[in-house]
Structures are given as structure tokens and as C-alpha cells.
Amino acid sequence: MSEAQAPLITEEAAERGLASSGSRRLSDGGGGQGSRKYRRRSDALAHGDRYQKAAALVDLAEDGVGIPEDVLNDTRFGRAMSFYFVYLRLDWLWSLNIFALILLNFLEKPLWCRKDALHACDQRDMYFLGQLPYFSKTESLIYEGLTLVILVMEILCPLSYEGLNIFWRSTTNKLKILLLFILACDILVFAFSSQPFRLAPYIRVVFLIMTIRELRMCAITLAGLIGTYLNVLALSLLFLLFASWLAYVTFEDTPQGKTIFSSYGVTLYQMFVLFTTSNNPDVWVPAYKISRWYSLFFIVYVLLGVYFLTNLILAVIYDSFKEQFAKQLVQVDAIRKNILQKAFELIDTNTRGYLDREQCISLLNELNKYRSLPKTSREDFELIFAELDRSGDFKVTSEEFADLCNTIAIKFQKEPPPSYLEKFPFYHSPVCGRLKSFVRSRTFEYIIVFVLLINLVAVIIETTLDIENSSSQETWQEVEFFLGWIYVAEMALKIFSLGFGAYWMEGQNKFDFVLTWTIFIGETLTFAFPSKLPFLSNGEWIRYLLLGRVLRLTRILLQVQRFRVFVATFFTLMSSLMPYLGIVFCILCMYCSLGLQIFGGIVYAGNPTLEETDLFSNDYLLFNFNDYPSGMVTLFNLLVMGNWQVWMESYWQLTGSSWSLIYFVSFYLISILLLLNLIVAFVLEAFFAEMELEKGEEVDIQSPTSGGIKKRRSMRVRSKGTMVDILLHHMLSNELDGSQNS
């Protein structure tokens, strides 16, 4: 298999389906006449009929990650898949081990403690250390040894189902073996000597990136645009060098030149910080005092550097980023299409080039057994087949079949079950009919919103009186207790009018039901037994629940279509942004480890040099690099650009070396100028793309045509992964077309 060849069977989907289908007995029917029933997907792949094999492959194709294609074509396929699914059943252990590796960075004792003084880290107040406990050297070695053993098992387990030849062709596997060897050597060196530097903290983060597929794809995408980024950085450097030289020459004989721009190196540094606007306008105050016209120089510099050059860098980088990202998506789509083509060929035994209605329904019936989606009715099978059959000829071609993963992700809206009260005659009386109509009306909704507003006012007043220790607080507590009865009545009326099944189908109603009963029971017990139950007599926890109830006011915003789109976009964006936020976290971990090894232990009470720094005068001593938790918080402050030059200049003074500037400047260039700007640009484009998708679905639902009616029946509730996939394809449609045509 060539290096570019991608794995075919998805690990994540296999794990998910295994968990959902392996614990229940499969129902009869479907999958062809007289088909055997298999409890696990591995059994179906090895021994099942063509529908069961195809269903397993379709389910595995959803996430696009898995074992190499060679294994699918191997004569020992059944045995290989048995080992593969054993490996997947241990996924919880592999995930827990990766988490343990990252956690070790926070718990191991900093190296400077072992180097400078044996008990230095016990003096937490002196060194401004965090509150997490530290492992001793013996404890760290035991912990690292256990994680190393599990890591070896995880990396070498694929040999059981891939074989040595296929395993060793993968660059990823080779890199893992190399890193594993370096990690083992680092642990051995650490066990027998005390070195001021270790590679283990960095390797742990690399393993995190290589283990999580989304992080790995994100890292590959970012690596692909390094060349473009270096080109625009060179342009920015030329601009900075020229502007610094111009500033140094212009203000040479002025107080600005004598106090701030004393040399070209200092001028270059100050102009770089001004490029980030962190020292604006402090850096040019001396020049401004001499002549107000000098401000034009700095204003033009900031406008060109911040609002033109920085945005130009962002535009070039984001364009390259989309191109690299599109290549990744094209590869994922090709993997999925390849697997679905194999599933199609398994069913199309007569090589007709299409699947008929009965074949598709048999496949969907088998998918019911393997997928984690709710069991689908026969009527829904017809709708899915209609979605696939875009040509309307009652035949699903291989091209139409390629959209199966997106189509089966649709969750069809079910008819609510009838109320249990339907069998009683009084439920159909005119009085009950008017009551049910009233509960379903807008008027009833407005009344509840009005009560919620009163509840909000009551909570604010009661909380204020509690802070002031006023005796009037009890009156407002009684008001809140009375309002609680209104919510119970609201819940009862809705269940009576809609039926519990229809009531429980709405997520908002589930939230209201749990919250209402929790608050009502808590308030009742508090009023009934105010002194016998100490926990309940403390009304603080009920107050927080009352504030949670007020969150129901968000339903007012959801009545507005634009706000509803905002909420939907927010949740979709959070899912799509997680890999990039994860990469930012990994960068922070890398720089935190480096910061501990470079700057660890130099910030401590009694250091005479420390008292001369801005770190001391601004009371930023707790934000240091003396231990891992403190370092992560410090880097977060640098990430948000909050007086970041204070740390840069203070550590310059503390170390006495200008080389320390490289640490902070490189962090700015990688984390802020590159990653955060990419995230901002990604959020902007993703927001507009999601708005277009939401508006398009709104038009489809409101369409009076038969297609609109059909869309109305199929409530498109997709998994987060599917929603993100659709959003990314919509965002990068132009780039994807270009990649596929090239």
C-alpha cells in the first residue's frame, strides 16, 4: 500500500456501533431470507450474508478512519477483524492512558526543584507555586512506567490485524515507534540521573495529537501552510526593519530617541511591541510631548501594521489554510466513497449497476441493528429510499448510494404517541377541548413568560435582601414558593393537554420537568422541615436552581428566527472549532514545558532583581513558570495579549539575556498571529455558511410544494459530526471543486 493510501474502516464508528449493537440481541427479519443473526459487527463481517457485511461497512464508513484496505482484501480477513475489534473494545483504556500522560505534566515535580534544592518545591509561598500535589521521583517513575506499558500495547496491537508488512509501511506507525523509543530512553535517563532537560513532556503532547484523528488532521493542515506563512512573515519582517530604522533615524536627537529609541536594537524591539499595540501609546508619549505632529508617524505605522499588514497576513494564510483543509476533506470523501462502493458491490451481486427498493430496504433493516441511531420504521425506510433516489426512477445508482451516510443520519420526526387519557370520555368533552386549546395557544405561553419575568424580579430582590440580611427576605421566599406551584400547574396542564409522550419529545419540556420537580421538592422540604435537614435549610442551592429556571426566558429569543439561527450556529461552531482549540492547548503545553525548563525557579520572594521588574510592580508574581499549572495560566494571559510585554521584559531582566525574547516572540507568532487569527477567520466564514444553511432549510420547510411537505415530515436532526461535515463542505465548496478537478 502506498503512503498516500488511506485507511478504510472507521475506528470511531466501529467502536460506537460495537457498543450499541454488541449489548443487545438482534431482532429477526431483514437482510435477506433465512439470514443468520449476529450480535457483533465483527461476526457479520467475517461470517454474515451480503446485507450484513454491507451494513457493517456502511456503518464503519461514517467517520472515515480505520484499518488499511489491504486487510479487507486479505484471505485472513475474519481473523484480522476479530483482533481489530478486540483492539477497539480497549479504546477506553487507550483514551484514559493519553489523558493520564497529559495529566502527568501537571503533577510531576518541576525539574528545577531537583536541580537547585531538594525541598524547594515544598516552599510554595516562597516560589509562588500552585496548589496541585507533586509526585515524588519514585511515584513519577511508577506512573510513567505504567503509561509506557499501555502505550506500547496500543501502538503494537495493530500488528495483530495489519501484519508487519502493512504496519511498517505507515509513516504514522514509524513515527510512533520512534517516539516510543525516545520516550523509553528519556525515562531511563531520568531514573538514574537528574538532568535539567527532558523530552518526555513534549512527546506526551505529540502522542495526544497523533492519537486524536481531528487533532492529527488539523496539525497536517497547519503543516501544509508553513511555507506560505514564512513568506508573509518575511514581508512583515522587512516592514518592521524598515519602520524601525526610520523611527531610529527620525527621533535620534529627540527625547524620544534618548529615552526610548536609544539604539537600533531597542527601537526594533519597541516597534515590534507597538505592532501588537500592547505599548500604545506609552511608547511614543515623549515624542508627542515635543510635537503633536510626531503622532502622525506612529498613527500611520499602526494603521499600516495592524489594520493592513496583519489583515493581509490573515487573508493569505486563511486562503492557504482552506486549500490545505480542502485536500484533507477530499481525501476523507474518497475514503468514504471507496467503502460505500465496496458495500454497493456486495449487494449488487448481479452487477446491474443499481440497487432496487427491496435491496435498499433490506440494507436499511440491517443498519438498524448495527447503527447507534434509534430503530427506524418501515415508513422511514421509504423516505430514506426516496432521499437516495434523486432521479425518481426507483433505482439507486452507485453515485446516489455514495450519499448514504448523510441520508441515514436524518432522524425522522415520529408521530407522538396518544395520551393515556384518550380512552376516557371526559377527555373529549367540550370543556377539556377548550382547556387543551388554551394550553396550546400563544396566550398560555405569554402568561408563563410573564410569570418567569416576575420570578426573575423575585430572585433578584430576594438575593439582594439576603446579602443585606434583611428580614423581608422571607416574604420573597414565600413568593418564589408560590411561583413554584404555578410551574407545577403548567407542567400538569401541558401533560394533560399533549399527553406525556408528546410532552417528553421536546427537549425544553424535559429541562422544565426535571428542574420544576427538583425545585418544588426542595422548597417543600425546606418549608416543612426548616431545621431538621441542615443541607436543605441552606437555601443557596435552591437559589441557583431558581436562576436555572429563569433560563427558560431564552425561549423568547428562540421565537425570533435570527436568534434561533444564532443558537444553532453557536453549537455547530463549537463542535467544528474543538480541533483547533485542541491544537492551541497542545501549543500551550509545549511552551509551558519549555518555560518551566528555561525560567523555572527564578521568580521567588527575596530575589533582588525581581523587585525591579514590572512583574513585581504589577503584582503578577503568581503568573510565573515555576510549575506547570502556573505556567499554563501565564500562557493564557499571553494568549489574550493582556500586557504580555510585562512578562517578556521581566524575564529579560531576570535572565539577563535577550535570548529569552525568542520564547515570547515565537509564542506570539505561532499562537496569536497564526492560530488565533485562523480561528477568528474560520468562525466568521463558518457563521455565514451556517446562516445560509439554516435559511435554506427554513425555505424548504415552508415550501408549499410536495417536496416541502416531505421535508416537513423529515425533521433533519443530525449528529454533531454530520452537521460539522455538512458545514465544512458548504464553506469549502469552491476549494473542493478545485481540488477534485485538478
UniProtKB/Swiss-Prot annotation:
Residues spanning the signal sequence: none
Location within or outside the cell: Membrane
Record domain EF-hand: where: 335-370, 376-411
One Pfam entry name: Ion_trans
GO molecular function: calcium ion binding; voltage-gated calcium channel activity
SMART domains membership: EFh
Segments on the Extracellular side according to the record's topology features: 104-140, 198-204, 248-258, 274-296, 468-480, 532-540, 604-627, 643-663
Intramembrane residue segments, as ranges: 259-273, 628-642
Keywords: Calcium, Calcium channel, Calcium transport, Glycoprotein, Ion channel, Ion transport, Membrane, Plant defense, Repeat, Transmembrane, Transmembrane helix, Transport, Voltage-gated channel
Glycosylated sites: N469
CDD domains: EFh
Entry membrane topology: Multi-pass membrane protein
Segments passing through the bilayer: 83-103, 141-161, 177-197, 205-226, 227-247, 297-317, 447-467, 481-501, 511-531, 541-558, 583-603, 664-684
A Gene Ontology term for the protein's cellular component: vacuolar membrane
Stated regulation of activity: Inhibited by Al(3+).
GO BP term (any one): defense response
Residue ranges annotated as Cytoplasmic topological domain: 1-82, 162-176, 318-446, 502-510, 559-582, 685-742
Region (Disordered): 1-44
InterPro entries on file: EF-hand-dom_pair, EF_hand_dom, Ion_trans_dom, TPC1_plant, Volt_channel_dom_sf
Functional note: Functions as a voltage-gated inward-rectifying Ca(2+) channel (VDCC) across the plasma membrane that mediates sucrose-induced Ca(2+) influx in autotrophically grown leaf cells. Acts as the major ROS-responsive Ca(2+) channel and is the possible target of Al-dependent inhibition. Plays a regulatory role in defense responses.
Family: Belongs to the calcium channel alpha-1 subunit (TC 1.A.1.11) family. Two pore calcium channel subfamily.
Free-text note on domains in this protein's UniProt record: Each of the two internal repeats contains five hydrophobic transmembrane segments (S1, S2, S3, S5, S6) and one positively charged transmembrane segment (S4). S4 segments probably represent the voltage-sensor and are characterized by a series of positively charged amino acids.
Assembly: Homodimer.
Protein name: Two pore calcium channel protein 1
Species, as recorded: Hordeum vulgare
Gene: TPC1
